Amino acid sequence: LLLFILAIGGAARIWLSLVDDGIYWPDEVYQSLEPAHRLVFGPGLVSWEYGLGARTWALPGLIAALFWLCQAVGLDDPRQYLVTVRFAMCALAMATAWAGYLLARRLGSEPLFAASGAGVFALAGPAVYFGPKALSETASALPIVLGLALALSPQATRRDRILGAALLCVATIVRLHNAVFCLALLAVWVGQRRWRVLADALVVMGAGALALGTLDKLTWGDWFQSAVLYLRFTFVMRGGPVTGDSPATYYLEMFARSMPLVTAVAAALAIAGVLRARSLAAVVAIFLLAHFVTPNKAYRYVIVAIPLIGALAGIGLQVIHDRWSPRMSLAAAALLVATCVWSLATMRTLTFGDIGPYEKTRATDSAFDDVGPVNRLLIVASRQPDLCGLRVETHHLTWIGGYSYFHRSAPLYSAAGPDRSSGLYNFIITSTAETAGNPVADDGGFVLRRLGAGPCTPDPSYDPRLPGYDDIRQGLGR
């Protein structure tokens, strides 16, 4: 059953990798793909986080390694290296689903029930949707789930617990917010009065913190620079969410909208699982509570909760089997898997109202392939031999794929950039209603048009930094 579930979930993610060029949130480009592209290939738009040093190079560094590998074997077309990254993210997602299975098994669940619980992350529509995206939340899910599987098992050896704590540190280096899991694990061991285990974990996590500081020192020049600047932005500058604050019930509402049947069944089974896996339940509760009380909310922030709740559901099936009725447990397992399959089958109906982040402004818009047509035209533009500059007249540069899709050493302007008579670019991406120049390609209501043969006038003032960079730099005193 586990292999079947993983195969279906993996196939769905691979299919999505090939047909969806949309962007859920700019972070999946400008905090992962774009800095990696700039590191390997040269050109790239610069977000304030990676211009000022408010994020670690862990995730972009890993993606850069994939880009270097692609470049070495001749896969240097955007379609080739982007699909490579998406496939790698899909592999991480499937490994995360397997880690959820392992977590349930190590906490007492039989293979059938553990596999059913793993189906929550492997098959549920929202989890599949986020699977190919190069977000720190999805990239760090595997070390979290695997780390907890090693650390929380009653049969865990000292080596298991040390390795589990180390994996949580790796997740924190990739995404600072994951420090909540480190604190939650420590809280569990304090509650259990396991002082020797706690001492080992403190040593490991101290080493993990040192690794984070060392990475920042090597890449940014200062110890813990990414953490310090991010915390300063969040708490001193009060950098709030672009989409506005959300109520404490936000995540419950979004789970119920995006996968209502899975949420109902998995939550009920997870409650039963608490009877046998109090330590895991405590970790999940601490993680969710921390996000419930934080005004800045986004669905992707809690994506790692899905495999953890799935593991609890698998354990809950075992509890039902052992304490009440084996027949009831089998029926509940079948129901859980069926709801996951239904969620996958109806995944294409997901809207931004279901999974955010535009639930307040674009709730009825499909969550799939948003700005995908423009990104595909960026790829087409990058293949034009006579291109010497491009202006995107339909979207702010923050909301499209940047140089990760526009794979050329040429200026990339937004609609607020120089006018067409400037001579600084000779291609535009605009609406299909536009008639200037000659059409080269069209996609979904947008068209790439050639204004002239070039060459373009050099632009010594071209600035690859995204808007808002200078304001944040001044606020941080950099």
Identify the function of each model-found stretch:
Residues S329-F427, T432, D443-G445, S461-R478:
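Membrane-embedded, lumen/periplasm-facing catalytic core of multi-pass transferases
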Residues H37, G131, E137-A139, A171, ...:
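Hydrophobic/aromatic-rich transmembrane helices and adjacent perimembrane loops
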